[in-house]
Regions:
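Intrinsically disordered, low-complexity segments enriched in serine, threonine, and glycine
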Residues: 5-303
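Contiguous mid-protein beta-loop-alpha structural module that forms a pocket-lining wall or clamp
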Residues: 1
């Protein structure tokens, strides 16, 4: 099987800052989708509470899809260097209370949108500091960049999601990028990805956004637990047996509930598997470490 060491980040500051692994399934010699067995070992110093895994399968696409929007790349924020932030910095934003506000935005060009391929993604916000008290809400809006606001440039506005006080991450409503049907041999138009926020009351709040991770939903599983995966224990997700369990001190136990499909490797494609981790305090530090080992079972079509 394949074994890789992963972190809770995907940037280019140093080798090994990866939250994914990839498999070239062309070399596996399988004619049918091959079930996958994953063993995720917690190599950190505290339990692992939430683990979200999303796969991106694509033929003839050698490059990894661009799934990270760094907070400091949004023009509306103030960049703050920080060694414990994704890409070495986060962005600080001022949110005026009492009305919805376009907090941060990123322009997605046609090359990025072609790679995103009209698929479904869940945006996961990672905050540098836990969210303050108050009924904070967040949502995403898509628009064409460069047009005057008077023309009503919002193309699609996704449902709002309420945040939890003290939490360091937030899963937003899934969205499709680009959201319209893809036309063969026609480049998609650039889009402005806008993060909007609302806080009741008057005055203002300061929000510190590290990054947004677009987790693929095509082949997706969410492992959730109130207990957590103990240090040095392994979470086994076995598509061979359709079974998920934890292995700790040579004993099998159940620590996590799973939501989603079991994983597979489609024939003749490149498959990327992306991981997002949350600790029991509801935070998502960038250097949470895991080791992932994967096996597949070859399947053949017999006539």
């Amino acid at each position: 099987g394949l074994t890789v060491a992963l972190k809770n980040r995907d940037d280019s500051l140093s080798a090994g800052n990866d939250n994914y692994f990839s498999v070239q399934t062309v070399a596996l010699g399988t004619d049918l989708p091959a079930p996958l067995r994953l063993q995720v070992t917690n190599t950190g110093s505290s339990p692992l509470a939430q683990l979200l895994v999303g796969a991106y399968h694509a033929p003839n696409r050698p490059d990894k899809p661009p799934l990270v929007l760094e907070g400091e790349h949004a023009d509306e924020g103030v960049e703050v260097p920080a060694s414990d932030a994704s890409n070495g910095a986060y962005a600080q934003f001022t949110l005026a209370q009492g009305a919805w506000q376009a907090l941060a935005s990123w322009q997605l060009d046609h090359n990025q949108l072609e790679t995103l391929d009209g698929r479904l993604y869940t945006p996961i916000l990672r905050f540098y500091t836990p969210l303050p008290a108050g009924l904070l809400q967040f949502r995403v809006a898509l628009s064409f960049p460069g047009l005057p606001p008077a023309l009503g440039t919002t193309l699609y506005q996704f449902p709002a999601v309420s945040a939890t006080e003290g939490q360091g991450y937030l899963m937003l409503a899934p969205l499709r990028l680009p959201f319209e049907a893809r036309l063969l041999n026609v480049q998609p138009s650039p889009l402005l990805f806008s993060l909007q926020a609302y806080a009741p009351g008057s005055g203002s709040l300061t929000l510190k956004l590290d990054d947004i991770f677009l987790l693929p939903q095509e082949n997706f599983t969410w492992f959730t637990s109130s207990v957590g995966l103990p240090v040095n224990a392994s979470l086994i997700d076995d598509a061979f047996l359709q079974k998920t369990y934890t292995l700790a001190n040579a004993k099998e136990m159940h620590t996590h509930h799973r939501i989603g499909d079991y994983f597979y490797l489609p024939p003749g494609e490149t498959s990327w598997f992306f991981f997002f981790q949350v600790n029991p305090e509801g935070l998502a530090p960038i250097d949470l470490p895991i080791n992932v080992k994967a096996w597949y079972r070859k399947r053949r079509r017999i006539l």
